[in-house]
């Protein structure tokens, strides 16, 4: 079981690195386009595949996973076809989060989560806040409502899905491995954002947004590490 989990995690890590490097060669829009629509379902798939033998009603969980992956892929393709950058982010987030909601409903124990899981939710909220400020910073005022919806979807995806999965793990060892894997998966994007921040001009419009984005992602990583220590 541990070897299967490590194999999935390592695969996701290198996939993350490749996608982030591809985004570095373009710009922030390219990173959003190529990385996030694929990373959400990939991380979701890795977690569920690793935990399926430990969870009740595994058939239902795999069914919900399939729905989530299908919806996320359809949303990404549709958004790319529309050629509107905001839709690429919102579509992938909304459809993936919709599948995540089904998974959360299968685990009502989320509402009895320990303090570390709620700490996860708080750090995830910081990342969602960075998403909404990034969108508001780069797009027109008429996209504000869609921006709020997108940030809400990311909050559901990162906080509720992650909390439900780690709660269902049951084993402290596996729980710690999941949190560590999540921190590792976030590091490449955090490093890329921090590196972009150092190159930004203080007079540049992107400066404040990039700083907030980098700090929020590093906060998520720090949250993972704190939960492991707890």
Residue spans of the language-model regions?
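Polytopic alpha-helical membrane-helix bundles and their juxtamembrane interface segments
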Residues: 1-230
């Amino acid at each position: 079981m541990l070897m299967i989990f490590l194999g999935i995690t390592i695969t996701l890590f290198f996939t993350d690195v490749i996608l982030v490097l591809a985004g570095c060669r373009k710009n922030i829009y390219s990173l959003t386009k190529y990385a996030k629509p694929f990373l959400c379902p990939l991380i979701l798939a890795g977690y569920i595949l690793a935990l399926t033998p430990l969870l009740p009603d595994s058939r239902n969980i795999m069914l919900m996973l399939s729905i989530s992956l299908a919806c996320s892929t359809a949303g990404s393709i549709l958004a790319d076809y529309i050629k509107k950058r905001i839709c690429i982010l919102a579509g992938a987030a909304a459809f993936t989060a919709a599948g995540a909601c089904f998974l959360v409903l299968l685990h009502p124990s989320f509402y009895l989560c320990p303090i570390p899981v709620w700490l996860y939710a708080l750090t995830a909220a910081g990342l969602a806040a960075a998403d909404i400020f990034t969108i508001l910073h780069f797009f027109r005022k008429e996209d504000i409502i869609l921006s709020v919806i997108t940030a809400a979807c990311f909050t559901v995806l990162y906080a509720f899905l992650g909390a439900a999965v780690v709660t269902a793990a049951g084993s402290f060892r596996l729980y710690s491995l999941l949190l560590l894997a999540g921190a590792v998966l976030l590091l490449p994007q955090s490093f890329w954002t921090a590196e972009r921040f150092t190159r930004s001009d203080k007079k540049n419009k992107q400066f404040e947004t990039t700083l907030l984005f980098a700090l929020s992602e590093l906060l998520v990583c720090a949250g993972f590490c704190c939960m492991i220590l707890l």
